[in-house]
Amino acid sequence: MRRHSSGSSEDDDASPVEAPHANSSRFSAKDSRSSAHPTTKLDHNRNADRPPSFSISRRSSSINWRLPESRNGNGTVEKRPSPERTSPSSPLGLIMTANGELRTKEVEKTPETVIPARRPPWRSPWAITFSALVAAIVGIGFLVAVLHSSVTRQLDPKGCRMSYMRPSYAKLNEFDTEHTRLASKYSLYLYREQDIDRDTKVRGVPVLFIPGNAGSYKQVRPIAAEAANYFHNVLQHDESAMNAGTRNLDFFTVDFNEDITAFHGQTLLDQAEYLNEAVRYILSLYLDPRVADRDPDLPDPTSVIVLGHSMGGIVARTMLIMPNFQSHSINTIITMSAPHARPPVSFDSQSVQTYKDINDYWRRAYSQQWANDNPLWHVTLVSIAGGGLDTVVPSDYASVESLVPDTHGFTVFTSTIPNVWTSMDHQAILWCDQFRKVVAQAIYDVVDVHRATQTKPRAERMRVFKKWFLTGMETIAEKAAPRSEPTTLLTVDDNSDSIIAEGERLVLRNLGTAGTVRAHLMPIPPSGSPGMKRFTLLTDTKLDKPGEHGKLEVLFCSVIPSQPSQSWAGFPSQMDLSKGSTGSTRLACRSAAPDVVSLPASTSSTQFPFYLNGEKEITPFSYLEYGVDDIAEHQFVAVVEKTTAPTPGFVVAEFSDYTQSHRTRHISLRSLLTFGMKFHLPAERPMVSEVKVPSLQSSLLAYNLRISHQDCNGDSELFAPLVRQYLAEPYESKYFVNAREATVSLHGVAPYVPPPLTGKLDENGLSFQFWTDPTCSSSIHIELTADFMGSLGKLYMRYRTVFAAFPLFIVALVLRKQFRVYDTTGMFIPFLEGLDLCLRQSIPLMLASLTLLTLSTGIMAPASNASFWHWRNGTSSIMDFQHNDLLIGTEDPLFLFLIPLIAIVCVGVCTVFNYMALTLTHLLGVLASLVTFHPGWIGNEDRKKTTPAAFFSPSPRRRMITTAVLLLLVTTMVPYQFAYLVACLVQLMTTVRAQRIASELRSTANSNFYNYTHSIFILMLWILPINLPTFVVWVHNLAVHWLTPFSSHHNVLSVMPFIVLVETLTTGKMIPRMGSRLKHVTSLLLFGMAVYAAVYGVTYAYTLHYVANFLAFWLAIVHSTSDSWSLAGLTHLYSGDAGIRKRGKEP
């Protein structure tokens, strides 16, 4: 038998992994037993008689114990220099030579004995250093704290009442492929409420409902049912409303087969194209006498009202930029929980580009100087956000302040809307009873069938939406009472004591105590009075409108000069309180009822601003607020007690100085976070006090508000303290009734959200309004402190998408370290060992650099963006809407700590993910070994000659054909994400096989190859979430029998490098070491990948696939450097070293 040389090329680092023989386990046990006993003198004599050698004969084992020679970058084998006895050792198993170079440490020789060379230490992929373990535990601890805080702290209460309906749907089958190519995939329906709508004829105003991501067309039923019932029970009996142009609403809804629009830009465009054709068809129905039942004197409809939920709101805005959009067919858009500001995820390039096209179009349209140049001049957009309970789409993304001016749209939160006053989750915003009532009534209020557009003019529509959706206390709120005509003639006795002295407060603890109708007259200070006077009134009783006979009415009155024989018949309502006295004064009065602001009732028994199903209905408070300039043309405010029997109820009315009731606390955010903020309301205070804190803008921070108890000297409070926190832009208000403690969170300046068109970020801030009983002569102490644990939960919704990017930052740095150690020492260290080395230097340096980069960009940014958008003035404007897109999405230096925080969390996540991958591969390896069958009659010698099937792969021709077929499918039918998923599965199987061999035969070559394949598998797994959404969309299309070839993602080059690399690894071919300058290319590619993932990964996550794809292309090239650049070399790239295995070793 020929003896083979121990220096065979099979031990090269670039060779295939060593295959374990059948007796490998027996040898390992024997070796372990022998190593457990000390060496005897006889053993030393045997070693001395034997010639020095570091290899063991095949008679004892087939395993080569010699350290493998390294292959340089040119593919030649380098012989290791002889060892030096005095060279110092290295922790990585290296020794220093005389010329200062590091090389692998070999066994030293002594003159007395020759010790056999030891096997390089086995590097377990499960092992983790103490420092890496601590970092991982800290990171996972932070992540658990964030998740725990998000579900336990700073939670908004749920206050939605259940809604009920009796739905039916009529499918419009005539809207078929003759109208649109997408009719075979999508369907159009007309909603009808049972027992109310008697047929399917259209006779009202068209409204189109667009469902959101994976939404159902049946989601229209709560709002459509409320609209049908409200018209049937109320409006059709209101003659004034019918004369004003109100008609019932015809709700159309679209069945998108629960399409996934959030993950696929082409699907979004397809839906917009289909809906434009649907709008054209809907408008044509009103021209067909067979299906329309309308007054022939009314104009035919030329536009529809659009109601969109979630991504349906984005589809609605997309319709206006599509080529098939019919001009002026949409002029009113109401969206609910729609992410207008940015895509919810950035995994698809077409989605990101579509968002950019939509938002650029809208901004460009509203920046035009003249209305005729603005194609969206008549369009109004109202975005309604659910608030903190919406955990599907961050409500920060619902902001349209960066898209439309306040003359054409606004953003409002459901907690702001009167009589709603609660946050809502992503689905509850559709069925919440009190909310759907407001939406239905608001739509009816903008309808006017006397116009072809079926709606009122734009300015009037905006006025209506602000009335229904805003509190009425905003600075833009318009007061209707001063502009109205006098409705009431009030006659009072000149000798009456009902006139309140100027400067005094009117306080009524009960109504009707006088036993007769009584008017309390409060003189109005003249305009321009010092202190900027304002009038405020609060009561728990509903204020009457003109002509109503309730308990209380508030009027603004002017004295009518007395003229003989003057007729008073022009007043619809007259109240004579003079009791027949000759000395009387007549007042012409306007009702304040149109300007009443509803506030949640705050008593000692209330807990929330709302009431739930089964609870007693709570009557809200009525509040009036006017500046003196608004009512300066009147002389008196008349508070009329119309009830004549003692009735529970209070009234507090006063004129107060604006300077006394409003204050601004200029405190830095750092001081507020460190020391908190304290202030007090004095005993002699107005009923309403307001405190503005401009530094409270960030949506990442949460606070706790505490209010001390007030002493009323034995009397009961008229009402419990009521607190309102609000932002001026967007319109977000939250109410706290019976307030003693309150949790404060807001949706202000948020990460990755573009700045508003006005750019007035520094002027805005969080404000607090306090309604307190002014009759209690005691001060109130208020304290605002930061809630750091509650603030952690706010990071979840704002930064959950970083897990699509930042882990790649960690993985790329670890891979870079693994390749650098491998090119230097020939050892491809395990992933966790590479992570430990990175934690000692690379990761801290990178985080420090990224922090300084963020700080420098924030300093260099123009101060508050000096050039803003100016409307209709012709000035050029520059606004950077992308400066929040990078890194952590904010340039505020206060939040720079988030960079290392996110990084340490990702270190923990990557560590856990690595152990999960190790567990998966080991389990699969165990399963594979269980199904492997070795016949018992095969002898040991035959087992030695048998090459295991671990890396027996199909022939090169078959693999090339398989790859070609897969790429052909990508080109024609399937998206490249499908091929990438296949590549991940193949890489998993390769890693499992490499793990089996490395565990059965512990050698450097096997360990290197396993660690290499495992790290590539980890990299591919972190890229997989970016590709899975598009794959899910493709599978969904197949599930709904939409067999049209996928319309995007067919670029073969986007996946070919991954396929080639994975196929190369299936041959067991280890990547060669790069001894020349080419090794720096790998390092630079991985370094660039890490930087790109950290800086651009969140906003442009889809590009990470392309970056990793380029890395795979480079690694495939490096694999091929062991051969010449020829067709034979390309074949060898696929075939590995199968030929070597067939030829065996050469002597």
Swiss-Prot record:
Entry's EC annotation: 3.1.-.-
Keyword Magnesium: no
Subcellular location: Endoplasmic reticulum membrane
Compositional bias segments (type: Basic and acidic residues): 28-49
TM annotation in the entry: 127-147, 795-815, 843-863, 893-913, 918-938, 965-985, 1015-1035, 1052-1072, 1084-1104
Molecular-function GO term, any one: phosphatidylinositol deacylase activity
One of the protein's GO biological processes: protein transport
Annotated membrane topology: Multi-pass membrane protein
Residues glycosylated per entry: 23, 74, 865, 873, 1011
Principal subcellular localisation of the protein: endoplasmic reticulum
One Gene Ontology cellular component annotation held by this UniProt entry: endoplasmic reticulum membrane
Residue numbers spanned by region Disordered: 1-94
Keyword Repressor applies: no
Positions with biased composition (Low complexity): 50-63
Domain of life: Eukaryota
Record's keyword terms, sorted: Endoplasmic reticulum, Glycoprotein, Hydrolase, Membrane, Protein transport, Transmembrane, Transmembrane helix, Transport
Catalytic residue positions: 310
Stored Pfam families: PGAP1, PGAP1_2nd, PGAP1_TMD
Function: Involved in inositol deacylation of GPI-anchored proteins which plays important roles in the quality control and ER-associated degradation of GPI-anchored proteins.
Family: Belongs to the GPI inositol-deacylase family.
Name of the featured protein: GPI inositol-deacylase
Annotated source species: Chaetomium globosum (strain ATCC 6205 / CBS 148.51 / DSM 1962 / NBRC 6347 / NRRL 1970) (Soil fungus)
Gene: BST1
